[in-house]
Amino acid sequence: MLRLFRANPSSVKVWRPISTAVYSVRQNSSASKPISESRVSISEVEKDSKDEKEINEVSLPWYLRDDITSSLVEKKEILLPEIPPHAPPQVEEFLTLMACDYGMDNIMLFDMTQLPDDHEYKENNKDVDFIVVATGKSEKHIYKAANELRTHLKHKYNAMPSIEGMVSSAITPSMRRRLLRRARKGPLATDNDYGKAANSWVICHHDGIDMHMLTAPRREELNLESLWCKPEDADKFSQDSFVTSESDHIFSGIRRYHTFARAYSSATSDLESIYYKLQSQPVDAAEEELKRLQNLFEQSFSHPSIKDHGLRFQFWKTLHLARPDLVSLAQVEDALLAKYCSAESLKADMTQEKIDDITEYVKLLIDTPTRDSHKASVDLAFDRLSKIISTLYTFSNEKFSVAKNPQLVPLLWRLTYVEVKEPVIGSRDVDRFIQEQVAVATSPGPVITMASNRARDILHLIGYHTKTHPGSVPTASLRELILFTYGNAGKWDKFWQEWDNYCFEKNFTPAESVEKWTRICVYLSMRRNKAEALRFLENYWNNASSVAGSVYKSLQANGEEFNSPDERVAFKRALTNMIAMFETPEKVPFEGILSYVDQL
């Protein structure tokens, strides 16, 4: 066990300002005489020296004196974990940085190389040899430490480490652009937000060493040590329940209520810890382990709150997505409806809770492995959804409204089709092509099966929602989702009709028009459908009679400028790829387009 000490402020030498030093000299200048003109004894010299020191100390402000720290304040002892002899020197270096430079406490080191061979976190199962866990004082403290650690690794090892959970509160111009790009995308069915504070858990990975920095409440809640410890040390990291005791103190009633709150909080933390362990399981996890976690969760599910019921639904949903043979879709539905059978639901306002749960349930219907590629599965999914909505709102004065959650409408549209071939080109693929120059090739034919009647119903719902909520119009991401759905289903007539209607209804600026044409070019180039590429070049490149306008006129109106260099490169590359689909004789009419694109 290594013992280090943080520097005591009293031992740091204080540099006085020049003005203070000059002032001290002037105070004693009248007493200084040449040696030949004065004869003084040693005692007089010592007395003068002592007087000068006292004058200097009196003249100094208190914050510049050396004795500003009380002698009663002890140095804080830092205990570092024992370092195995086979550990690389970086382990000791990182431990010292955490303790002495960054001020972390309660530091632990876990050696993955000493775990049993069948352990999940054995070094040959994971790309990690050592794990360091430390506690920070606050989220801001952890962010500062993570930033310093990243700078240290960058300058000393010439490497940019992988850091997760580090979130800056500042909004840079590049972040604003990313947020704007993200706003154009449709909501993802697999997106999850667990409401944890930013920088409460930051992970840095470098050269086989993971460094976890957590706040004390988050570390106690997750109990990560139980995942990486040796089997014989598991009891050391088990979380003990809080024990209450009777008291005749006058405030015992208040303390009792406080104790109950802590007990519920502890139960919630246990459920979250079990849920985290379930998420950490590998894809091929044994059925016995999943059943053990399932039983452990149900045993800990006592005095449930509304939050606990929501966590239970997420737990069963995760189990169903991983092993539908172990947990059926009907069981997940029962876990969802159990929330509204509890006494807590009668006391709370469940208006927003209902619409959020319906949104999560739609995500479940989209992601469930039991969904096949036939149109009948779409009808079955909508039937299940209608029954859930009916159950939640039958004996309620509330009315179901899609306006209360902006994610719901895109998810309902996503529920109208099933994928039959991969990949299916979507908005994210177009974004990757523009931002990262990553192209995805797909089959030119239909890659999804679409339930046209259900799609028509959702369009009617969107139209009704637009009429009943003035000022509410379908977002650009939703319109693009609908457009790409028609293209992926091979319904190209509806695709171009939707494109014409969209461009006719919206009064785009020249810059917005260039962006829209770039995205449609990228999509068509990745779909690789020769007939639709030909239709685009003939009807939309420079056709004055087109309802949607033309690419050439939009470029001219914007001064042949693009919104970013990446957008320019993506446009030129996509248009070149589209023309390259044709054989040489067919390519001749488009030589003028190629020449124009080359000079952009």
UniProtKB/Swiss-Prot annotation:
Q: How does it sit in the membrane?
A: Peripheral membrane protein
Q: Where in the cell is it found?
A: Mitochondrion inner membrane
Entry keyword set: Membrane, Mitochondrion, Mitochondrion inner membrane, Transit peptide
- The answer to whether keyword Manganese applies is no
Family annotation (SUPFAM superfamilies): Nucleotidyltransferase
Transit peptide start-stop: 1-35
Instruction: Provide one Gene Ontology cellular component.
Output: mitochondrial inner membrane
Q: What is its main location?
A: mitochondrion
Extract the Pfam families matched here: RsfS
Per the database entry, which stretches of residues form a coiled coil? none
Q: Which InterPro entries match?
A: Atp25, NT_sf
BP terms from Gene Ontology: mitochondrial gene expression; mRNA stabilization
> What Gene3D superfamilies would the database entry show?
Beta Polymerase, domain 2
Task: Tell me where on the tree of life, at the top rank, the source sits.
Answer: Eukaryota
What does this protein's UniProt record list under function? Probable mitochondrial mRNA stabilization factor.
Q: Which family does it belong to?
A: Belongs to the ATP25 family.
Q: What is this protein called?
A: ATPase synthesis protein 25, mitochondrial
Name the species this protein comes from: Clavispora lusitaniae (strain ATCC 42720)
